[in-house]
A protein has these predicted regions:
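Acidic, turn-prone loop/beta-hairpin segments
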Residues: 60, 137-168, 196-286, 306-311
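Single conserved hydrophobic/aromatic residue that forms the stacking wall/gate
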Residues: 1-10
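Extended, non-catalytic structural segments that build the interaction scaffolds
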Residues: 23, 107-113, 162-183, 226, ...
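Catalytic adenosine-cofactor/nucleotide-binding cores of aminoacyl-tRNA synthetases and other
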Residues: 58-62, 66, 70-147, 247-253, ...
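Core structural elements
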Residues: 93, 118-131, 151-163, 181-202, ...
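Short amphipathic alpha-helical coiled-coil/interface segments
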Residues: 120, 160, 164, 183-188, ...
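Metal-dependent nuclease catalytic cores in nucleic-acid-processing enzymes
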Residues: 28-45, 285-291
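C-terminal low-complexity, glycine/proline- and small-hydrophobic-enriched intrinsically disordered tails
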Residues: 244-429
């Protein structure tokens, strides 16, 4: 009746018509979508929808459309059973760039959905840890605690405001894969990798009460916003965790996450100064970790640190964060200046120069020998590639892509050797 009678009460009401967005595949654009629009104008005098979103086609790694006849299909129910609906949804959404198809390996389903599975697990584990840390007691309203917020609190609130704005803009433009990527980076790369690590000590029951309450309220506020942003993509794990978040006394809480209002970017939380300071701090910790790994410094080994240059007040800001630097970078002292002796150097994103003394930390002579052997090996491989490129017959007769690959290989080998020579010079050679 509804299909054949456009004058029925249901069809003539404004409840279902017109819609907003039609989601469909491109192959039926002319045969179905265009005809729906024509019939809408014919019988209702207006189009049935205002926007059409054409999604890609799921294909195997050979680019073939999945079908029963080819036997290359993936049963979504089996994926849900094995990894969960959230993992499947995030994997697909993160690949659905506009104008492209989605490629999944039907012969290795675990690898195909590993990214979504790992992210869903990360959300769950981080959410559980946060819930245990903040407890069940009601939190205080954020506006009442702004004077007690630490720098990391102001930073993550500012990052939440940016993430909210970018996710909203991405959804409005149907850039779903960009939304998934941005929220992945925000939750995993900013909340988990940095903020949770920085506030762990403040969430302990022994911590100063004002600092602890500020950390609790900030963490819950950020998770509330993050779960609302992530909910359209990973609905189940976010709804479960969101329902357990503590709430301020007397605040009206939505019945469920699915009906909670979409968050709006809070201009009051934007703090470009604290974001710039935090970026320098993150760059320092990241570079120290990289140097520790490159030179084989053990996890439990504490090292010193010298910093010079960078923006005005950068070293003072590091001094304020000394405990955090020591905790995250395994550093036992931070000094101002160029540093001297045998060690490793790095330049931070803000232009500051970093020096890590290595005398007595590693076996310097052994590290010198290792680097020299690697340089000799790289020089030998490079000589072979350059000899090949010096052969006019090879350059003239070989396919262009083969010659270009050889040239790129030579440039990479030269770059690797030059970097090792710089490191070797830092060790006194």
């Amino acid at each position: 009746r509804l299909q054949g009678d456009w004058s029925s009460d249901v069809c003539s009401s404004d409840l279902f018509y017109p819609g907003h967005t039609m989601v469909t595949a491109p192959e039926i654009l002319f045969f179905w979508v265009a005809r729906m629009i024509m019939m809408g104008y014919e019988f209702r005098g207006e189009a049935p929808f205002t926007q059409v979103y054409l999604h890609g086609t799921v294909r195997d790694i050979k680019g073939r459309k999945m079908s029963k006849s080819l036997g290359n299909g993936i049963d979504p129910l089996e994926v849900v059973e094995a990894f969960g609906a959230d993992a499947m949804r995030f994997t697909i959404v993160s690949q659905c760039a506009v104008g492209t198809d989605i490629s999944l390996d039907h012969e290795n389903v675990e690898a195909a959905f590993a990214n979504g599975r790992n992210f869903a697990n990360k959300i769950w584990n981080a959410g559980r840890f946060a819930l245990m840390s903040v407890g069940d007691a009601p939190i205080q309203p954020l506006d009442q605690l702004r004077g007690d917020l630490a720098e990391e609190d102001r930073w993550i609130l500012s990052r939440l405001s940016h993430a909210t704005e970018e996710a909203t803009r991405g959804l409005e433009r149907f850039r779903l894969h960009e939304v998934a990527e941005r929220l992945y980076h925000f939750f995993w790369g900013e909340i988990c990798d940095w903020y949770l690590e920085l506030v762990k000590s403040r969430l302990n029951v022994e911590a100063d009460e004002a600092s602890r309450e500020a950390a609790r309220t900030t963490l819950v506020t950020v998770l509330d916003g993050a779960f609302r942003l992530l909910h359209p993509i990973v609905p189940f794990v976010t709804a479960e965790l969101w329902a357990r978040l503590p709430w301020p006394d007397g605040a009206q809480r939505p019945e469920d996450l699915i009906v909670a209002p979409w968050p709006m970017p809070a201009d009051v939380d934007r703090d470009e100064t604290v974001e710039a300071d935090m970026a320098g701090f993150q760059s320092l910790v990241t570079e120290v970790r990289r140097l520790r790994k490159e030179y084989g410094v053990g996890e439990g080994q504490r090292i010193g640190l010298s910093v010079q240059g960078g923006p005005e007040g950068f070293f003072d800001s590091l001094s304020v964060r000394a405990a955090a630097v020591e905790q995250l970078a395994r550093v036992d002292r931070i000094e101002s200046g160029a540093g001297a002796g045998v060690g490793a150097n790095a330049v931070l994103s803000n232009g500051a120069e970093l020096f890590v003394p290595l005398e007595g930390v590693i076996d310097v002579e052994r590290e010198r020998e290792r680097m020299q052997k690697e340089i000799t090996r790289l020089e030998g491989v490079l000589a072979g590639v350059e000899k090949r490129l010096a052969n006019e017959q090879f350059v003239s007769n070989a396919p262009e892509e083969v010659v270009n690959t050889a040239r790129e290989n030579a440039a990479q080998l030269q770059d690797q050797a030059d970097k090792l020579r710089e490191k070797l010079a830092g060790l006194g050679v």
